[in-house]
């Protein structure tokens, strides 16, 4: 299994086992984010400022990276790396920041179900940029696997759950509220295309600079999250009046922040030693974890559409990673 396939060539079996464990752990943590966030809701809304949670997540990543550097400083190569190598990570942080904010603005121009279905186009944009920017070629078998991933995401988003007692699958709505009709405006479509392109570009660009630089991953993360903290601090300061910095935080909110921070570090290892395609499979496979936790913690019922999505994901994994 090659690096691009999500494995580590030439590694001894214990190291390969640790790599596989890391992939499973990242998948589980990615899938747990939405259910944990739902458990934070009070009266149907998030009681804290989202910008506070994002800033705390970036700060946690930065502190974990700094601690890792302090612990392993004796194993570093001699000499101080030139700080100009930090500059490329400013663009990476900017792309991630733009992507996160576009998600918020997209909700104004389309309904949530339309967004969930169409946002799976980022799988195609990531694969296209992966081939164009990194010079990799995907076989017809691998291309079909990625198409199956897109179809699985669309199936899952279009009706993987239903509320107990509800005969039709679909997104939950407030009691007594009329369901929002499916819609998307021309501006919303343009923003969605931009979102998918930026999502793919941020992933591929980060992979490119991480693999080109011969620097420890912890130092690269330090560069990335330093810029991330600066950017999100500015976004928080400019977000206008609202709850205080830690107002509304609960134990579940702290768990959301820690989960996102640790998973961000795991994802950076995937980008350094794996590939953007590996990341796509982690995100897609996390739908299964998301569904199981939503059923257990939120009492949502799985529908036949979910099992179809899970089947498509399994087929995609077999096609992409299996022997021809």
Curated annotation (Swiss-Prot):
GO cellular component: Golgi apparatus; Golgi membrane; mitochondrial inner membrane
Membrane topology: Multi-pass membrane protein
Residues on Cytoplasmic side: 1-18, 74-85, 164-180, 236-248, 301-324
Catalyzed reactions per annotation: CDP-L-ribitol(in) + CDP(out) = CDP-L-ribitol(out) + CDP(in)
Subcellular location as annotated: Golgi apparatus membrane
Metal-binding among keywords: no
Keywords, sorted A to Z: Golgi apparatus, Membrane, Sugar transport, Transmembrane, Transmembrane helix, Transport
A single MF term (Gene Ontology): pyrimidine nucleotide-sugar transmembrane transporter activity
The UniProt record lists the keyword Ribosomal protein: no
Topological domains, Lumenal: 40-52, 107-142, 202-214, 272-279
Database matches in SUPFAM superfamilies: Multidrug resistance efflux transporter EmrE
Subunit-structure text: Found in a complex with SLC35A2 and SLC35A3.
Family: Belongs to the nucleotide-sugar transporter family. SLC35A subfamily.
Function: Mediates the transport of CDP-ribitol. Does not exhibit CMP-sialic acid, UDP-galactose and UDP-N-acetylglucosamine transport activity.
Protein name: Probable UDP-sugar transporter protein SLC35A4
Lineage, uppermost ranks: Eukaryota, Metazoa, Chordata, Craniata, Vertebrata
